Amino acid sequence: MEQQKKNIKRYTEEEIEKAASLDIVDYCMQNDIPVKPDSERYYRLTEHDSLIIDRKKNQFYWNSRGVNGNIIKFVQEVEDASFPGAMQRLLDGEQDYEKASEITFVSEPYDYEHFEQKEVSRFDRAREYLIEERKIDPQVVDALHNKGLIKQDKYNNVLFLWKDRETGAVMGGSEQGVVKSDKYKRGAWKSIQKNSTANYGFNVLNGEPRNLKFYESDIDLLSYATLHKHNLKDTHLISMEGLKPQVIFNYYMKACERIGDVPDSLSLCVDNDKAGKAFVERLIHFRYEKNDGSIVAFKPEYPQAPSEEKKWDWNDECKRVAKQQEQREQGRRAAYLQQRGMER
């Protein structure tokens, strides 16, 4: 007994504070504890819906058991861990949990009218950028512009409007500059409009949302649509504007409500890189049962990276395919001209 006591690690106040600062919802996401959002702030466990998580306070309340507390207490209660066991799991060096203090909440509602004033009727610069620079299919660009999903502002930025597919309301927006400059970290202006509604993103619905596909960016979404435009029946394409599981679960719940069943497929069309693969690992263990008893799980759908590339996204793939097509066309044109010359 004395030896067991000696083997129990004692944690410092700093370590306890560090553990307590970690976000409960992110811990759940990374450890296959299914949660569902009631709102931006409140979540509940799927298997114990009387357990509510207040993400803003980073506290949980298990109403049926009369238990509440911070993330350390959460791990003890939900995973039946001792205090040292909970601390060990939270401070595991292989996991990188978000800090609760870094989770942002919208304090003011999104005001589309404010941003709408910057929109212009012309679409020339935005269209040219998407087609010539990003190699997006002109038919895809024009179709989405005609639907009011992609526009141009007075600064010539491309505007991606985040529309709610049920109400038609604009929930937020993202902006992509068309001029390269060294003063921008990513080479060009890129921004999410202020107070854009949490858990939404740029999205395109073709038919019913029976197949959900999630992307890291608006451009990746358009690139995928370019490469697979003939195979998108009953498909909802959604940009997470990064790697955000909250966006995924929001649109998953909306799809279930609309079709009255679990979607037929859930695809994570993320970058083929370390971060994208780590994100997939967080979600592939979730299982959902359809009305007919079949099981649906998240599946990765990476762009095929060349062997020498450590990072490859869907726009990289779109550009690669476009270049191959251009080279084939040049080859055919050269062969045709050569043949004409021989005939003369």
Swiss-Prot record:
Official protein name in the record: Uncharacterized protein pXO2-78/BXB0107/GBAA_pXO2_0107
Transmembrane: is it a keyword of this entry?
A: no
- Classify the source by domain of life: Bacteria
Quote the biased-composition stretches of kind Basic and acidic residues, using this chain's numbering: 323-332
Q: Name one Pfam family in it.
A: DUF3991
Q: Which UniProt keywords apply?
A: Plasmid
> Could you tell me which residues belong to the region Disordered?
323-344
Q: Which SUPFAM superfamilies match?
A: Zinc beta-ribbon
Show the GO MF annotations. DNA binding; zinc ion binding
Q: Which GO terms describe its biological process?
A: DNA replication
